[in-house]
């Protein structure tokens, strides 16, 4: 494991960490009850089974 040679200031630490950005969730088109909706892929099966309300997307 890498060990830093010198202490890093708080400003530099926060600047380095702020480079990580969250990506947008990929939406998938699914036909449920005759209407086409775009929902996250991980919720497709739950939406088809009726466990999740699709109107909130």
UniProtKB/Swiss-Prot annotation:
One of its GO terms (molecular function) is structural constituent of ribosome. The keyword Ribosomal protein applies. Coiled coil: none annotated. It holds the Pfam family Ribosomal_L32p. InterPro entries: Ribosomal_bL32 (IPR002677), Ribosomal_zn-bd (IPR011332). One of its GO terms (biological process) is translation. It comes from the Bacteria. The keyword Ribonucleoprotein applies. GO terms for cellular component: large ribosomal subunit. Signal peptide: none annotated. Transmembrane segments: none annotated. Keywords: Ribonucleoprotein, Ribosomal protein. HAMAP family: Ribosomal_bL32. Belongs to the bacterial ribosomal protein bL32 family. This is Large ribosomal subunit protein bL32. It comes from Corynebacterium diphtheriae (strain ATCC 700971 / NCTC 13129 / Biotype gravis).
């Amino acid at each position: 494991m890498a060990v830093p040679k010198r202490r890093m200031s708080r400003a530099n630490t926060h600047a380095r960490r702020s480079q990580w950005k969250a990506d947008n969730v990929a939406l998938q088109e699914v036909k449920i009850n005759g209407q086409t909706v775009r929902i996250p892929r991980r919720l497709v099966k739950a939406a088809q089974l009726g466990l999740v309300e699709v109107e909130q997307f």
